[in-house]
């Protein structure tokens, strides 16, 4: 499931980061948690991808309302955007990877990398359920990403450059910003 979620984040410009405890079905549903979305200066809101991600969440979790999600992109370099979010969240710096130089504690922000086509292939069945006919042969190349954990009422942030836009079947050489719980 984490691989599929990560792939969905890459392909749909989102990392369906759906963390949290599930409530028993006998309990009253809780109010959705309000998030303070911090938007990188000059970033553009990607409404089609945000809505597609919400639809994907509804397919994966049909009995739950979609979580608050926002997807943006910017021309700014990945490292510059990562520094902005790490500082705004009060974290020290971005670790080179999730192991944090083999430390026992997972860092609050770290780099990762991946392959666009393998990530798109991993979510192809979900794309078919959503009636999205993306040409996955165009998802070529490697990407760098940064994962930044949530803090208080602030969402988890996933940054990626470049990213594959499944709605247009093209690789976009911009930094994608996904904010989700």
Language-model regions, residue ranges each:
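Bacterial N-terminal signal peptides that target proteins for export
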Residues: 1-11
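C-terminal motif of bacterial Sec signal peptides marking the signal peptidase cleavage site
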Residues: 17-20
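An acidic-aromatic pocket/loop used at catalytic or ligand-binding sites
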Residues: 22-181
């Amino acid at each position: 499931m984490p691989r599929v979620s990560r792939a969905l984040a890459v392909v749909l410009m989102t990392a369906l980061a759906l963390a949290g405890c599930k409530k028993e079905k006998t309990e009253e549903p809780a109010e959705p948690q309000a998030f303070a979305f911090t938007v990188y200066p000059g970033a553009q809101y990607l409404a089609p991808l945000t809505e597609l991600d919400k639809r994907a969440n509804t397919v994966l979790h049909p009995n739950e309302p979609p979580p608050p999600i926002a997807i943006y992109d910017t021309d700014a370099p990945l490292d510059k955007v990562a520094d902005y979010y790490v500082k705004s969240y009060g974290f020290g710096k971005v670790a080179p990877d999730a192991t944090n130089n083999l430390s026992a504690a997972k860092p609050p922000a770290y780099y990762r990398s991946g392959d666009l086509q393998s990530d798109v292939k991993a979510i192809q069945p979900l794309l078919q359920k959503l009636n999205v006919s993306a040409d996955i042969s165009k998802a070529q190349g490697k990407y760098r990403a940064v994962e930044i954990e949530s803090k208080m009422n602030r969402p988890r942030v996933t940054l990626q450059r470049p990213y594959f836009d499944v709605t247009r079947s093209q690789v976009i050489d911009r930094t994608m910003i996904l904010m989700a719980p």
